[in-house]
Amino acid sequence: MRESGILMPVSSLPGPYGIGCFGKEAFEFVDFLVQAGQKIWQILPLSPTGYGDSPYQSCSAFAGNPYFIDLDTLKEEGLLTAAQLKAEKWGTDPKEVDYGTLYVSRFKVLRTAYAAWRKQCAGLYGCAYYFPDDYYAFTLANEEWLDDYALYMALKAANGMKNWVEWDKPYRLRDRKALAAFAAENEEEIGFWKFVQYKFAAQWQAVKAYANKKDVQILGDIPIYVSADSVDAWVGGALFELDADGGFARVAGCPPDYFSADGQLWGNPLYNWEYHKKTGYAWWVRRVRHALGIYDLLRIDHFRGFDTYWAIPADSTTARTGKWENGPGMELFDALEAALGKLPIIAEDLGELFPSVRKLLADSTFPGMKVLQFAFSGGDSEYLPHNHVKNSVVYPGTHDNTTLTDWWENGASEKEKAAAAAYLHLTGVKPTAKELAAIRTDDVRIALLRAALGSVADRAIIPMYDWLGLGAEAHLNTPGKLGGNWAWRAADGFAAKALAKTIHDECSVYCRV
């Protein structure tokens, strides 16, 4: 069945509190998707943002982002007042997330809400340590990760938010007596972090249930690696490659290529795949099971890393010293499928791929990705629409690409422009510089959107900013750039009925409605 969807990060929704969240704007966006004939809402990872404000560098592979909790809902529950919300600063530009300001204001009001909730519970149950049944149900269902997460965040707060490798040895090495003593002395702080996850889960499940009721599926995203500064790394131990001192032996990255002479040094700890194999990939089963409770479909980032991955000594300053190692391959996905059933996974298979990676993708039967911005650099590219396959997902660009408008005006080379113009019938087959200069940017944008929708690929996902025709201001992420990413927010009223009709009509032409 041919269908289409829209890539729209939760953080990019409009709203009064500095960042998109699970409030009325999320429900209104689902309504917009329905009006536009869309079946998929693709979002970025819902994990807490970490280094560089990235959702791909999170403090937890299981926790949700506290920033997404809707504060108006907490106000309706009697946990916050309008005056308390009005007193805080949420940023100066409603079209951009100010993560620095948000870090201060969000946690301040969430702590206020937590104190009010504790007081509310004490009044209801006559005891300061009795809580609602759904809270106990949530903590019990998620105890495998929640207890460690809450303890980790409390320890992090007590240590000035430093990386756990800088904590005192008893905490760093998880000495039982030291952790038990800390937990006893910091019950309220640990409770705060559980409360945050409790509210996150309740609100997100309400949004997801509403979307599913409207026949809209949520396409989520899980990074292959965890952050070095995370509860997963702190607790994981044998899950990762460790040296004799218990530190990380090697870290993740990419080898040198045309774009980077030194390669990319990501710094994420690498998995000890031999250990995972011995456990039947139990941690991965837990992780994917948890993700399937949050999302309907899963995009797995850096899929090629399950076949072969670049391993770099932890003390290296560049990725040049790394080498290729073999990943778990189909054995991992067979274990996941045996435990969880058929997996609704989309593989991020972009970039140069070894034949073995292509074989893994074929053996898994997961759909891969086709990105049109990569199609026009020369030759018979696999990303050109005539080379697409049915079992794939086509995108004009991903969150790591700029917008179509900015790509044409500032990103594409003259060679790419000429190839795209000819392919999209915007000029003759050999356009002159004058002919290229005469092309309207919006004509290119619409032609690329139609090329994506017209692809044989089963699914077409269009970023919201490309439907809106936005430029560089909406560029979500520039790989390798630290700071200034993940900030774009849509303007109030962006999800207009007229735009929904345009999207519906365009998708109807290509039988995606």
Predicted regions located by residue number:
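Surface-exposed amphipathic alpha-helices with a cationic face
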Residues: 34, 204-212, 337, 361-362
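Outer-envelope exported proteins of Gram-negative bacteria
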Residues: 44, 217-219, 223, 297, ...
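Structured C-terminal cap/extension of enzyme domains
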Residues: 469-513
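Catalytic domains of carbohydrate-active enzymes, especially glycoside hydrolases
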Residues: 24-49, 293-295, 452
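Conserved, well-ordered alpha-helix/loop/beta-strand core segments that scaffold catalytic motifs
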Residues: 193-226
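Mature N-terminal, pre-catalytic/accessory segment of carbohydrate-active enzymes
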Residues: 1-37
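Alpha-amylase-like alpha-glycosidases and glucanotransferases acting on alpha-linked glucans and related
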Residues: 9, 18, 53-197, 201, ...
